[in-house]
Amino acid sequence: MPPTMLASVPTRPRSHPFRRRRGAAAAAPPLLPDQIAAAAAAAAKRPAESSTSASSCFHSEVISATSTTCPTSLAAAQRPEKRPRYQDVDEEQPAASECSEIIGGARPRAAEVEVSESSCLASVLESYLACPEQLANDAETTAYSSAREDLTLSETEEEEEEEEVRSGPCICTDCSFSPLHESSSSSDDDNAVPSPTFSLFLALAEQFVPFTHPKTPTATDVALQAGEGKRFEDLDNEVSYERFRRRERRGVVARDYIEVYSSMLGSYGRAVVEQRVVMVNWIMEHSQAMKLQPETVFMGIGLMDRFLTRGYVKGSRNLQLLGIACTTLATRIEENQPYNCILQKAFKVGINTYSRSEVVAMEWLVQEVLDFQCFVTTTHHFLWFYLKAANADDRVEDLAKYLALLSLLDHKHLSFWPSTVAAAVVALACLATNNESSCHLVMETHMRTKNDDLPECLMSLEWLTNYAS
């Protein structure tokens, strides 16, 4: 029995009061009535104790005192008072953690479990992976996750969703934000002060202008033909390739928004075109300095282009902030530890410096505008498939990846699907290295739709051959 546990209360006296033990001394002389009364008064003055040893001693005193004088009350005195099975609610109970330290194996109470879980969660949130900025006034949170939806879609659901892909221009006149943004104006607590980052997010959201131009050149959206084109020999590669081809058309419109901004009145449209080139160069230089993966570069530029396709934020400073936020957001998504941690407190583009709070606020706006659908296919995802179809060597592979990066500088590739741009880049790399047979294999693998625009894409990217030497 552990030393901290109380001894059980005996259900009967240890020995009969009238039975003398063998070899024991003679019984003590009986007490007088005055002695009995004095013993009872002394016992009444003692404080009540929960210990079993004290009660048993008092019990033995009363039994020994009344054994010779009060035989009628002997039976009642012999019965010890039953101890309640459950302790009183108001009685203080020892913590489970204290008992477990002494006796071990004790199960903690629910309250202690909640405290321990909250403390563990707090320690996790203080890690490098978590952003120190927290959203204020978040009355509601949505359980929708586009990334989880993409990962759990079955092939049947993908085929059904393929029919609902938008092939026309993205008219964002009814652009609405999530309940997170709406809760800022309808919060129950009027005295709550939002954090500085959340205040910046609200200011950027007010400056956002949805893209409303109805006529923009878009890529044709035609369903993939089952019997068209050359297939991969490996079934897994074929299934993955077809899935990427369907996914690139899900909720994304391929169009050149630069022509629309160029036709806008005023100088802001021209500023968008100029700042895009500046930020694409900055993203490439930043990725090279931070040793980021090529996937991060393509995703960062892709997020910026998709944002500008749906709208823009007024001010050239905000355009640079948009490029930084898209890069940091892509870094969080694509990079492994510890490179996915954004530890910089300031970002500098030219002579302009941007704080971490500004970048995080723009990250929130980018996710709001894109409906939190940041996991999209890029040109880099298709390079592997076409290089494998062409049986390319290291020289062709390095040249194709280099030309793919250069294609990001030109806005003309935005009018084509990422798979078309990747096929055109690999085909140009094959032609530059005198591998015409490999070029035909790439074109046969890609052209699985009627009226495919791969020839037009090759002509628009023909300037890349000047950098192939």
Curated annotation (Swiss-Prot):
Tissue specificity: Transcribed preferentially in early stages of meiocyte development and during meiosis in young flowers, especially in anthers.
Recorded GO CC terms: cyclin-dependent protein kinase holoenzyme complex; cytoplasm; nucleus
Name of the protein in its database record: Cyclin-SDS-like
Knocked-out gene: effects: Normal vegetative growth, pollen production and viability are severely reduced, male meiosis I is defective.
Family annotation (InterPro entries): Cyclin (IPR039361), Cyclin-like_dom (IPR013763), Cyclin-like_sf (IPR036915), Cyclin_A/B-like (IPR046965), Cyclin_C-dom (IPR004367), Cyclin_N (IPR006671), Cyclins_cyclin-box (IPR048258)
Species this protein is from: Oryza sativa subsp. japonica
Comp. bias (Basic and acidic residues): 79-88
Gene of this entry: SDS
Entry annotated with the keyword Ion transport: no
